[in-house]
């Protein structure tokens, strides 16, 4: 009986052992949690696309084509010298015909094509129309020529190469007062575009501070820009020797042609960057005699870098570059300087925009439009020059001429 009981106990013990081993063998062990994969750095090198929008056709095509051509020359020079930080640059420039809605569409095409940095728009309305989208997309804007004060507002990653309108208007009054030019003046401006209105308002405010007397103010609109007889007669009646014309070159050409022979031969016509291109627009260059424009660029500046650009432009495009071409050229070199300062080596850098914005506030660019730095609100700090047209040629103005 005892032997039987021992045998039963042994059998039960074996059965329990087998059951335990079976249960352990059937248990599914959870695999060890995998460490999250570290984010791989973006591959170095590649092509970094710079996009731009501007009028390549239409009334203001001279501005858009000049910016595009100047920018392309800079891109070609940089790539020929080995690129920047192992990357090559490409330029994709879309035609807006000067229309803000078309500019928005063109900006969208550039984003779809892989744009990483933007030249914004050539005109102020174009740039203002895409600034919000660029902020949302995380794309830095450096517009060569959008000068309206509000063109880059609302986006901390928006900068410009040109002077803002209010700065140009103020500087114009300062230049007239400080360089022995007539201080009894007339003003002729376009009252339905921001560029002209902004320049006039700033000029008027500074003129009062600088002892400049505005004898008459004459205006026109887009719908009345073909006949300036009334305005010219009023200017003549005022007896002034200087007319401030903060307008674009196309309207200026019409005005100067109609004013020829009606205003005194020695009358000075003083404008800003919008007059750049007047010699290519006006039918008779003699009608542009004594036209002055405040600009940061002068094609006859003997500076070696300026003359190198003028030569390259003449070889590749033909003719003499205007300020807009120079602005486009400087914008690309500013991008290059910021890329180098930020240490960006790949177009796919996930922090490209943030790095570029920080770098823009630290770089100094020895541009052909003057040595430039930028403020936190995107405004350039650089000197201005004045040009005067004599015998169909624009040249640097020297006080006392």
Feature names for model-found ranges:
Residues 200-294:
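Extracellular/periplasmic bilobed ligand-binding domains
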Residues 44, 48-72, 94-100, 122-123, ...:
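Extracytoplasmic "Venus flytrap"
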Residues 110-122, 142-144, 185-189, 239-249, ...:
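Periplasmic-binding protein-like
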Residues 256-329, 390, 394-396, 400:
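Extracellular/periplasmic periplasmic-binding protein-like sensory domains
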Residues 315-325, 336-394:
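Segments of small-molecule ligand-sensing domains
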Residues 1-49, 80, 112, 136, ...:
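Short, low-complexity disordered leader/linker segments with a strong preference
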Residues 62-69, 81-152, 161, 220-228, ...:
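Beta-alpha junction/loop-to-helix N-cap segments that form part of ligand/metal-binding clefts
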Residues 158-219, 242, 335:
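An alpha-beta-alpha
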């Amino acid at each position: 009986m005892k032997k039987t009981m021992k045998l039963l106990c042994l059998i039960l013990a074996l059965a329990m052992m087998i059951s335990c081993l079976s249960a352990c063998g059937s248990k599914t062990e959870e695999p060890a949690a995998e460490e999250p994969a570290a984010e791989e750095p973006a591959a170095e090198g590649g092509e970094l696309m710079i996009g731009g929008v501007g009028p390549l056709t239409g009334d203001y095509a001279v501005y858009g084509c000049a910016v595009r051509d100047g920018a392309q020359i800079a891109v070609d020079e940089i790539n020929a010298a080995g690129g920047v930080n192992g990357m090559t640059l490409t330029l994709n420039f879309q035609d807006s015909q000067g229309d803000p809605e078309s500019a928005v569409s063109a900006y969208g095409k550039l984003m779809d094509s892989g744009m990483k940095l933007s030249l914004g728009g050539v005109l102020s309305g174009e740039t203002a129309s895409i600034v919000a989208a660029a902020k949302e997309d995380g794309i830095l804007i450096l517009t060569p020529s959008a000068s309206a004060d509000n063109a880059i507002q609302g986006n901390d990653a928006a900068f410009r190469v040109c002077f803002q309108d209010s700065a140009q208007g103020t500087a114009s009054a300062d230049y007239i007062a400080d360089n022995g030019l007539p201080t009894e003046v007339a003003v002729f401006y376009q009252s339905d575009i921001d560029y002209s209105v902004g320049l006039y308002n700033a000029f008027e405010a500074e003129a009062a501070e600088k002892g400049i007397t505005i004898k008459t103010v004459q205006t026109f609109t887009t719908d009345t820009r073909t006949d300036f007889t009334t305005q010219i007669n009023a200017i003549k009646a005022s007896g002034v020797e200087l007319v401030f014309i903060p307008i674009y070159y196309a309207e200026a050409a019409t005005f100067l042609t109609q004013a020829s022979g009606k205003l005194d031969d020695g009358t000075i016509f003083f404008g800003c960057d919008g007059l750049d291109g007047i010699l290519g627009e006006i039918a008779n260059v003699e009608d542009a005699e004594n036209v002055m424009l405040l600009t940061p660029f002068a094609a006859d500046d003997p500076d070696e870098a300026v003359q190198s650009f003028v030569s390259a432009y003449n070889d590749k495009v033909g003719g003499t570059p205007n300020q807009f071409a120079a602005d486009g050229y400087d914008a690309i070199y500013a991008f290059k300087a910021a890329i180098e300062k930020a240490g960006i080596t790949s177009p796919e850098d996930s922090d490209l925009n943030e790095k570029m914005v920080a770098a823009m506030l630290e770089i100094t660019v020895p541009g052909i439009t003057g040595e430039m730095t930028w403020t936190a609100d995107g405004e350039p700090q650089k000197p201005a020059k004045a040009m005067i047209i004599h015998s169909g040629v624009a040249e640097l103005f020297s006080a006392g001429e």
